[in-house]
Regions:
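Non-catalytic, topology-defining segments of multipass membrane proteins
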Residues: 1-29, 62-179, 246-313
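Short hydrophobic alpha-helical membrane-anchoring segments
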Residues: 10-14, 34-37, 41, 167-171, ...
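Membrane-embedded alpha-helical segments that form the functional core of polytopic membrane enzymes
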Residues: 13-38, 56, 60-70, 186-190, ...
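Transmembrane alpha-helical segments that form the membrane-embedded catalytic/substrate-channel core
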Residues: 30-39, 68-72, 129-138, 182-210, ...
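Cytosolic-biased juxtamembrane loops and peripheral soluble domains of multi-pass membrane proteins
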Residues: 38-53, 77, 82-95, 136-150, ...
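Short acidic-hydrophobic sequence patches enriched in Asp/Glu that either
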Residues: 48-56, 72, 187, 248
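Short, surface-exposed connector motifs at secondary-structure boundaries
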Residues: 175, 235-237
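ABC-type nucleotide-binding domain
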Residues: 232-233, 241-244, 248
Length: 313
């Protein structure tokens, strides 16, 4: 947080020349993403045990990406973790072919913005994906998360408070400074966060058994990025032990590789993103990804496979 405050002050008070502003935006964006990953671990109980303390610290950590801590608790901790890669139930999962065909909004989103099918505009799902998805989840929480009306009002209020804070900052520092201190960093944070969220599950098969060795993928990154993201790439490990601190992720990985070497799945983050760019984002069945606009089909990432399956279009 100190990095964010110092860089924001430097931008607002013009302590740095104009060409340095994008660099500060990048630094703030990395810090925004890092705070979200800290909040993720806090809300799982990996750092704090008391519920009120978790909500308070989590709320601060999620503030840069304007996410209510109560919404995150239901969306991520309760619904996603209980239904990981359960088709048309997991809120973080791409749709089934039936849902794609039956919902115009789903078809529009997949055809125009999903990362896949070699569509370059799909990169927008990295740049804007988390902000758009969190707004969608907020608006549809009563239906997709089975949230009560009272709880929904609370998360809307929390979100409005966060929006008011950022609007107040914009009024204080001015439009140009706000663009470099918040808007551009928000895009940077989206790219970092979505690069992990998408690759951690979207290449994997659908499963009703909530089996992390089947429905999740761990992605590897340079050590500095592991540090920024609190080892979020160790995602199989996280889904097996969600309340365990990320500092134990490497040890858990070693045990999983020793116990189930044929089932544990991992690849470099860049390779996983490249595979997403090549493949479809709609599930024809549990193990087949399709691109309805082209008719292409690919096998999901199954244990024991490490080569990109050829399209059967």
């Amino acid at each position: 947080m100190s990095v964010i405050v110092l860089a924001t002050v430097a931008i607002a008070l013009r302590w740095v020349p104009g060409p340095a502003l994008p660099v500060l935006s990048l630094v703030i964006g990395l810090a925004f993403a890092g705070m979200l990953f800290v909040g993720h671990e806090v809300m799982h109980g990996g750092m704090l045990r008391g519920r009120r303390a978790r909500l308070l610290v989590g709320g601060v950590c999620f503030a840069p990406l304007i996410v209510s801590p109560h919404l995150w608790t239901v969306w991520h901790n309760r619904v996603h973790h209980a239904n990981a890669n359960r088709i048309d139930v997991d809120p973080d999962m791409y749709p089934s072919l039936a849902r794609y065909r039956n919902h115009r909004a789903v078809r529009f989103a997949i055809d125009h913005f999903a990362l896949g099918g070699r569509r370059w505009r799909g990169l927008l799902s990295l740049v804007l994906g988390f902000t758009v998805q969190s707004a969608e989840i907020l608006c549809t929480a009563r239906a997709c998360l089975q949230m009560s009306a009272r709880a929904h009002r609370r998360v809307i209020l929390e979100t409005l408070v966060l929006c008011a804070w950022w609007l107040a900052l914009a009024g204080v520092v001015g439009a140009t400074a706000f663009a470099f201190a918040f808007l551009l960093p928000l895009l940077v944070a989206n790219v970092i966060v979505m690069s992990f969220i998408l690759t951690n599950h979207s290449l994997s098969p659908a499963t009703d058994d909530n089996d992390p060795l089947l429905g999740a993928l761990s992605v590897t990154t340079p050590r500095w990025l592991e540090w920024v993201t609190l080892q979020f790439g160790y995602h199989v490990e996280h889904h097996l032990f969600p309340t365990v601190s990320a500092r134990h992720a490497r040890a858990i990985r070693a045990e999983l590789q020793a116990l189930w070497p044929e089932r544990y799945q991992s690849m470099p983050l860049a390779a996983a993103l490249a595979r997403m760019f090549e493949t479809g984002r709609v599930y024809r069945d549990a193990t087949t990804l399709v691109d309805p606009s082209t008719g292409g089909e690919w096998l999901a990432l199954l244990p024991g496979t490490d080569e990109l399956p050829t399209s059967r279009a």
